[in-house]
């Protein structure tokens, strides 16, 4: 057993000296346990991660929980391996922290397998080169922002526009339609939101297909920096060992960067642009490159991205953009119209909205919808000033169809049934394309626009329209 002792404590950074020739490797986990109590009366049981070798047999480590109660001279034991977390089926339906320890009060997780949180990305020969769409059953996403299986999607939105509801619906649909597994990593967000999500998912009945990992705002930066990797290693197990199509949700990827910035400053590194860490691109790349499809299975990630001061050129979101295959932009203006999911059909983009991947029919329909909605956007100023009467007959038709398309992009969600009173709908991609194409072709010009609001397939809209017309 390799035992050192604490020589310096600066906040969450702890320097530990080991005997000559026994200095632990970078990323090794160090344990400090003591019967001495901290300020809250808890016995000290602390895990730290080696971040730097300082020379003179001393290492600088970053703590994964509070360093309250630590004193110089305390014994520190090198575990000889990186931080590991339990993986596999026993973790489903459970809530864990950065170290894989349960925090849901349901007892220990009994798993015979543990994965290190630091793992290399899959080699190129094992990666799948096939571009394939992941069917989500959400019309606006499947049509305009198709998700790449094994890809990375950014979810951009302010407070209260429905990020969490979309996340929950995706978890629900993947679990029920594909038998898929989801991992939710809460990185540096509000504890209340994590609690709400846990309760809502329990009520919606999707928790047994999900593992949740939390490192919240009140945790030290070391935990917030590593919790995304804990979530990722849980997802990698299901991909590599069970061949599952796994969904990884990270909320919020900006907090991962923010925690990295705090740790970097504490380690004494020279800051780079806007005060961020000089290793920003490396840290982001090491994590994002592990999120990919292999010949065995896939890890598809949906990452909520907070944009500081709405500045997309800020180094944190700008570095994230480089890795994304698609961006789903949630708009407050659309939410105010009562159209949910409040996805902006003109701002959202996907790399695989390409006729070679999704097929020509899908591509032409999606572009047709965007063209009509763009024209409607251009005409809105004229309508506001002069009214509909001043438009040409062609433009009146465009406006009528655009308003129907806009409403048809809304959809009742399974996880929101308790609030909307409407049963949720899963719409297959073929049905989605056919419905929008029929509206573009003018087959439903006779129906009122309310018929298209909060329905699933086009047949439901026609039926609702007939009822409205009496």
Swiss-Prot record:
Molecular-function annotations in GO: ATP binding; ATP hydrolysis activity; proton-transporting ATP synthase activity, rotational mechanism
Cell compartment(s), UniProt: Cell membrane
Topological category with respect to the lipid bilayer: Peripheral membrane protein
Alphabetical keyword list: ATP synthesis, ATP-binding, Cell membrane, CF(1), Hydrogen ion transport, Ion transport, Membrane, Nucleotide-binding, Translocase, Transport
Chain's role: Produces ATP from ADP in the presence of a proton gradient across the membrane. The catalytic sites are hosted primarily by the beta subunits.
Family statement drawn from the similarity comment of this UniProt entry: Belongs to the ATPase alpha/beta chains family.
KW Oxidoreductase (keyword) present: no
Class in the EC hierarchy, top level: translocase
Positions that bind ATP: 157-164
Pfam families: ATP-synt_ab, ATP-synt_ab_N, ATP-synt_VA_C
Reaction equations catalysed: ATP + H2O + 4 H(+)(in) = ADP + phosphate + 5 H(+)(out)
Gene3D superfamilies, alphabetized: 2.40.10.170, Bovine Mitochondrial F1-atpase, Atp Synthase Beta Chain, Chain D, domain 3 (1.10.1140.10), P-loop containing nucleotide triphosphate hydrolases (3.40.50.300)
Keyword Lyase included in the entry's annotation: no
S-S pairs: none
Protein name: ATP synthase subunit beta
């Amino acid at each position: 057993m390799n035992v050192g002792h604490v020589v310096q404590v600066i906040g969450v950074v702890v320097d530990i000296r080991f005997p000559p020739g026994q200095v632990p490797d970078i990323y090794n986990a160090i344990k400090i346990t003591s019967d001495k109590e901290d300020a809250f009366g808890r016995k000290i049981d602390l895990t730290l991660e080696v971040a730097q070798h300082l020379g003179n047999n001393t290492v600088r480590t970053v703590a994964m929980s509070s360093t309250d109660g630590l004193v110089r001279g305390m014994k520190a034991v090198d575990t000889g391996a990186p931080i590991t977390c339990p993986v596999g089926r026993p973790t489903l339906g459970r809530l864990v922290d950065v170290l894989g320890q349960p925090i849901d009060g349901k007892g220990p997780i009994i798993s015979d397998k543990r994965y290190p949180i630091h793992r290399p990305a899959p080699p190129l020969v094992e990666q799948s080169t096939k571009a394939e769409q992941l069917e989500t059953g959400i019309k606006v996403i499947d049509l305009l922002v198709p998700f790449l299986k094994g890809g990375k999607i950014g979810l951009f939105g302010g407070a209260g526009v429905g990020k969490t509801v979309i996340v929950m619906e995706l978890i629900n649909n993947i679990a029920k339609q594909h038998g898929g597994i989801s991992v939710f990593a809460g990185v540096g967000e509000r504890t209340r939101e994590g609690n709400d999500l846990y309760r809502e998912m329990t009520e919606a009945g999707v928790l047994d297909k999900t593992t949740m990992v939390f490192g919240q705002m009140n945790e030290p930066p070391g935990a917030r920096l590593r919790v995304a990797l804990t979530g990722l290693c849980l997802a990698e197990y299901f991909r590599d060992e069970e061949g599952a199509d796994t969904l990884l949700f990270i909320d919020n990827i900006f907090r991962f960067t923010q925690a990295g910035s705090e740790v970097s400053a504490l380690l004494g590194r020279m800051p780079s642009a806007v005060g961020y860490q000089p290793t920003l691109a490396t840290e982001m790349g090491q994590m994002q490159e592990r999120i990919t499809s292999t010949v065995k299975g896939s890890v598809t990630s949906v990452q909520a991205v907070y944009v500081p001061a709405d500045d997309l050129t800020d180094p944190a979101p700008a570095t994230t953009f480089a890795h994304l295959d698609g961006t789903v932009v949630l708009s407050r203006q659309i939410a105010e119209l009562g159209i949910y999911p409040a996805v902006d059909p003109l701002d959202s983009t996907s790399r695989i909205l390409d006729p070679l991947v999704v097929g020509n029919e899908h591509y032409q329909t999606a572009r047709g919808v965007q063209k009509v909605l763009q024209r409607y956007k251009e005409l809105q100023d004229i309508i506001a000033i002069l009214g509909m009467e001043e438009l040409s007959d062609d433009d009146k038709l465009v406006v009528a169809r655009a308003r129907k398309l806009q409403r048809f992009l809304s959809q009742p969600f399974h996880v929101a049934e308790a609030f909307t009173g409407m049963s949720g709908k899963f719409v297959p991609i073929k049905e989605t394309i056919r419905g929008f194409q029929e509206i573009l072709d003018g087959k439903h010009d006779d129906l009122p626009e309310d018929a298209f609001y909060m329905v699933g397939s086009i047949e439901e809209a026609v039926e609702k329209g007939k009822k409205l017309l009496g």
